[in-house]
């Protein structure tokens, strides 16, 4: 246990989401898909254009590049150089996954000659944060979608037992005491209190930092990569100039659709 972990005290035990949230995940994700189809054209009109810098999108636990293909196409149309993670289904940090991710990041930086923005859903967001922690000079910013990096995450996650079966805790290659600390790059955590897979309290920053922000949206966990509110947020965050990062500020209609914004 690290000194910072000792200072915070024992790991809190946070319960998983309620049965109601878990059982309605699929139905609510379907609503998000329908909302996306209805708002897709408007999204393309109001989303800020990109500057061509590279972006890598990482899938959540048990997901693959197909799961976030629609989001990647949207960002490509905004003029970003978008890439998937290219490693099939995300089963956790096993079989050298983190080493391959490091190589993937280095390759993209060499190919484009610029730092990469990382967008990660759930477990993919945790991987993104750890890459940025290890290679801050190669990562422009991190955007996590419902990623349980906070303390108490193992008790607060419905698929925790399956994850632990595939990735025994004693074999995890990442220091678990550091996960809740933000990496030294601009970092945005997008979360929903309606998350039916992981408890929302583990998906946002506990403490304020100069370059971190947590933004609350309405939606499910499984539908985050197909949520039009999140698509707009990701586009807005990616469009912020690298040397001029600023927190997201709600204005007008955004105050209704994004109910919580805090450091």
Q: Positions of the model-derived regions?
A:
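Residues that form generic nucleotide/phosphate-binding pockets
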Residues: 33, 104, 233, 237
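Flexible, membrane-associating and regulatory peripheral segments of lipid-active enzymes
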Residues: 1-56, 68, 73, 78, ...
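Short beta->alpha connector loops
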Residues: 36, 62-63, 196
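Helical cap/lid subdomain of alpha/beta-hydrolase-fold lipid enzymes
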Residues: 133-134, 139-263
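Histidine (H) residue identity feature
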Residues: 27, 44, 53, 83, ...
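Serine-dependent carboxylesterase/thioesterase catalytic core
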Residues: 53-66, 70, 74-185, 190
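Sparse, context-dependent recognition of short Cys/His-centered cofactor- or disulfide-binding micro-motifs
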Residues: 18-23, 28, 40, 46, ...
């Amino acid at each position: 246990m690290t000194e910072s972990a000792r200072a915070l005290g024992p790991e809190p035990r946070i319960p998983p989401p309620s049965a109601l949230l878990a059982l309605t995940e699929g139905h609510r994700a379907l609503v998000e898909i329908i909302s996306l189809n209805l708002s897709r054209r408007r999204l393309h009109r109001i989303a800020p254009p990109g500057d061509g810098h590279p972006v890598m999108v990482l899938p959540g636990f048990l997901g693959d590049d197909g799961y976030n293909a629609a989001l990647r196409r949207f960002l490509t149309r905004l003029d970003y150089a978008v890439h998937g993670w290219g490693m099939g289904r995300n089963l956790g940090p096993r079989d050298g996954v983190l080493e391959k991710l490091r190589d993937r990041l280095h390759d993209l930086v060499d190919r484009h000659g610029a730092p990469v923005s990382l967008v990660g859903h759930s477990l993919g967001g945790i991987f993104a944060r750890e890459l940025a922690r290890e290679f801050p000079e190669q990562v422009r910013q991190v955007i996590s979608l419902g990623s349980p990096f906070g303390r108490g995450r193992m008790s607060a996650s419905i698929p925790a037992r399956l994850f632990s079966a595939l990735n025994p805790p004693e074999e995890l290659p990442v220091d678990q005491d550091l996960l809740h600390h933000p990496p030294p790059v601009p970092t945005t955590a997008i979360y929903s209190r309606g998350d039916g897979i992981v408890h929302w309290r583990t998906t946002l920053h506990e403490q304020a930092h100069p370059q971190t922000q947590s933004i609350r949206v309405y939606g499910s966990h499984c539908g985050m990569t197909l949520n039009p509110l999140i698509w707009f947020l990701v586009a807005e965050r990616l469009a912020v100039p690298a040397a001029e990062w600023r927190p997201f500020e709600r204005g007008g209609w955004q105050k209704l659709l994004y109910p919580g914004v805090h450091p």
